[in-house]
């Protein structure tokens, strides 16, 4: 299944706010999750919607998300928590959380177009997994810096999560540590996502 490129407002009406996909928010009363035709949602549908929230927020294909679930399942600790940490430490997501891009698709474009360096080297893989002490900078070119500055200026000025430090005047950021669960950028029940995939096998 390919990455979603359809109408974004349709998805947030169905699933609720997805800040990684779009800065828009569903208007009060427009949330279709509470307007199921059958009245009460089935447990399967609840798990499916949580999985879809995760997938659309982080801009993943079905295959990519399944791969992350499998990696998390083999790691020590809670599978759901490890899954969220893996997704949050992706380069495209970190650029979004820093305010260097207004959405994760926008951050992905910055990376794909080679505007971003990690530890002094150009990285053009949006899924690159950032590590503590990684230094993220923009290319020393006017266009690269102009794109970043535009995003920083237009960002809603939300607090940068504690695992990151942004130096906006230097177009630079530091990854301090692996993200803690309370700083995850999405309201999600990750256990339902893990349950969804465990019931598919």
From Swiss-Prot:
Residues in S4 RNA-binding domain copies: 89-150
Gene3D superfamilies found in the cross-reference section: Ribosomal Protein S4 Delta 41, Chain A, domain 1 (1.10.1050.10), RNA-binding S4 domain (3.10.290.10)
A GO CC term assigned to this protein in UniProt: chloroplast
Predominant subcellular localization, coarse grouping: plastid
Classification via Pfam families: Ribosomal_S4 (PF00163), S4 (PF01479)
Family matches, as InterPro entries: Ribosomal_uS4, Ribosomal_uS4_bac-type, Ribosomal_uS4_CS, Ribosomal_uS4_N, S4_RNA-bd, S4_RNA-bd_sf
The entry's keywords: Chloroplast, Plastid, Ribonucleoprotein, Ribosomal protein, RNA-binding, rRNA-binding
UniProt GO molecular function: rRNA binding; structural constituent of ribosome
Cellular localisation: Plastid, Chloroplast
Name under which the protein is recorded: Small ribosomal subunit protein uS4c
Name of the coding gene: rps4
